[in-house]
């Protein structure tokens, strides 16, 4: 079920504003992207059950000393994923079989070198909960079909296309390990290619995210993932436009307190992205001067 017109109109309006504001501010946008990498790395790895905290992830990426309890594997997982993110953000790469394999090799180097940059081979099966992914013999053809569908579909709305490809990719699970992290990087590759900023899929919303795959595998229902991608795009645009405007950014809780209004109502609106709120390190924030009456209701 495609994203509805009101959401499309909000994204269109936000993108137009973003495009106008970003002119001549490449250095600020780069700062935002770089500051966001630890949070993005933390969330994507946490979805895959990494035990690293956000603070530990930040220390690893800054080459600072971390607790002896942190495994070498998790150190490489953080560093490698950050490297993949930097590569994705370095240019408008076309999504292809070759690029997907390259990203996977970068992700698993020094972790699982024997499978890095390789699709599952004969006899290599994967199970996600009760779902068993297609046999290795079907990977090349199925991925090729998904890539062709994505590149040739000129009718579907862009967030719907990205959601469908993500569902197809994760349902296929072409790798022995690293499928989720690569899949989420592909989302950002696709967004950057068409001029949108990168997004973060949040670990705290993991259950809802996983429910999107179940809905697709059980009933070919794409609605949940379409909603997740669209709201993530709006949140990313809200964050960047706030910084590009030079706004004084405060916590949403403080904003609600300042105007003596109910915080739960604002949090609900933030989650729906009907107010220009965004998260940093898991905390909802907003422009202090935001005053669009009614949008928080």
PLM feature segments, named:
Residues 1-177, 181-297:
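FIC/Doc superfamily catalytic core
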């Amino acid at each position: 079920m495609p994203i509805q017109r009101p959401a499309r109109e909000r994204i269109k309006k936000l993108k137009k504003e973003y495009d106008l504001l970003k002119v001549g501010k490449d250095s600020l946008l780069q700062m935002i992207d770089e500051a966001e990498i630890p949070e993005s790395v933390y969330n994507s790895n946490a979805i895959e059950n990494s035990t690293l905290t956000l603070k530990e992830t930040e220390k690893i990426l800054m080459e600072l000393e971390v607790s002896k309890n942190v495994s070498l594997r998790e150190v490489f997982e953080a560093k490698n994923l950050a490297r993949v993110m930097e590569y994705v953000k370095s240019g408008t790469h076309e999504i292809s079989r070759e690029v997907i394999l390259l990203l996977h090799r970068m992700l698993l180097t020094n972790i699982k070198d024997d499978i890095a940059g390789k699709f599952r081979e004969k006899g290599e099966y994967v199970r996600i909960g009760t779902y068993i992914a297609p046999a290795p013999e079907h990977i090349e053809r199925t991925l090729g079909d998904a890539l062709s569908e994505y590149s040739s579909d000129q009718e579907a709305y862009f967030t719907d296309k990205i959601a469908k490809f993500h569902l197809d990719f994760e349902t296929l699970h072409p790798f022995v390990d690293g499928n989720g992290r690569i899949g989420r990087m592909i989302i950002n590759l696709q967004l950057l290619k068409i001029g949108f900023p990168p997004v973060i899929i949040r670990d705290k919303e993991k259950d809802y995210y996983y429910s999107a795959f179940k809905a697709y595998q059980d009933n070919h229902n794409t609605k949940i993932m379409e909603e997740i991608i669209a709201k993530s795009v709006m949140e990313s645009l809200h964050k960047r436009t706030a910084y590009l405007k030079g706004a004084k950014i405060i916590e949403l809780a403080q904003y609600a307190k300042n105007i003596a209004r109910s915080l739960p109502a604002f949090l609900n609106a933030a989650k729906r992205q009907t107010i220009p709120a965004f998260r940093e390190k898991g905390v909802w924030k907003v422009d202090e001067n935001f005053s669009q009456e009614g949008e928080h209701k």
